UniProtKB/Swiss-Prot annotation:
Annotated signal peptide: none
Membrane spanning residue stretches: 1-21, 357-377
Cell compartment(s), UniProt: Cell membrane
One protein family per Pfam: DUF445
Keyword Phosphoprotein: no
Any one GO CC term of the record: plasma membrane
UniProt membrane topology term: Multi-pass membrane protein
Lineage: Bacteria, Bacillati, Bacillota, Bacilli, Bacillales
InterPro entries for the chain: DUF445 (IPR007383), UCP032178 (IPR016991)
Protein name per the record: UPF0754 membrane protein LMHCC_0318
Species of the source: Listeria monocytogenes serotype 4a (strain HCC23)
Family: Belongs to the UPF0754 family.
Keywords per UniProt: Cell membrane, Membrane, Transmembrane, Transmembrane helix
Amino acid sequence: MSVLFTILLMAVIGGFIGAMTNYIAIRMLFRPYKAIYLFNKRLPFTPGLIPKRRDELAEHIGKVVVSHLLTEDAIRARLLDENLQKEITDTITKMFHEKMQLETTPNELLHHFGYENAEIRSMAWIEKTMEKEINHFLSTKKTTKMSDLIPTMLESELTTKLPHVTERITSKMALFVASEEGKSQIKQMLQKFFEEHGKMGSMARMFINVDSFSEKIQQEGLKLIDQEDTKNLINQLLTTEWKNFEAKELQELIPTEKQVHLAGQLTSELIQTFPHEKLFNQPIQVILRNYETTIVEKVIPFAVERMLDFVATHSAEIVERMDLAKLVETQIATFSLPEIEKLVVEISGRELKMITYLGGILGGFIGVIQGILAMWI
């Protein structure tokens, strides 16, 4: 009985010593947090291993994360993963549908981002920029001929339209001459002609019936207008004037002293025609609703794909600029020692307990062996 008791006692003592040794060793990884001094001498193993090597640990963890976990290839592969693309697309699509249920005007949206009086400030900026650009254009192009300012397509289109303009002019002239107003104008011109020529005019009026002569002039005028030579002459005059216009420099049409006034006037006219009230106060959803299907089916998937492809292509540069190793090191360095201890215990608490139990088992086993050996010695 005494032999068995001795062996059990040695086993219990050995198990206790083994378990406590491992427990203390584990605790010494974290404790004490600071060095302990006795008679101005630092006690060994103070501070604990992790507090003592904290900076080195943070640096090495950062390097390990970048070298073996968040590598460029791993990041690129993840960014090009179709599942990730689908998840991001679905998330953005869901957010888009949620926003489409609201009624948000551009004014409200800009106000949300801290941009006050958006409509007034935007229109003031547009007006200022527009006037500046018009002034700049007029100043830099003042010696440029109009033929160089007018787009080739527009010039060609206007040139081909000249015969149509001629037809329209002769048509309007014929309509006017044939009208009662035209006849009245001819009669007034004849009467004025006679009055301006004194006695000769009075004598001519004795032999000429103004009404019948007016009708005759009216008929001859219509014949003259309808003649091909007349149309050719008008067309030639228009062509000549157009060529003269093209040959002029911009400053001949708009003198330098009038440029500022013209730019301001033109800007004001353009601003008045700009529907800014409707643009800034109409819900964005109303504008987008006509394109909702296209945005969901094409725009969002395309934008997500292009964005991920861009990030993947430049992942090496992005990772380098982000300096992930330094980022991880900095984040770990911000943790307090109790937080690091808690984090490690939460992650590997079970394993640490098993190490303690293993120390107890080994200590107990060694105690049994010691008890047996003690009986033999």
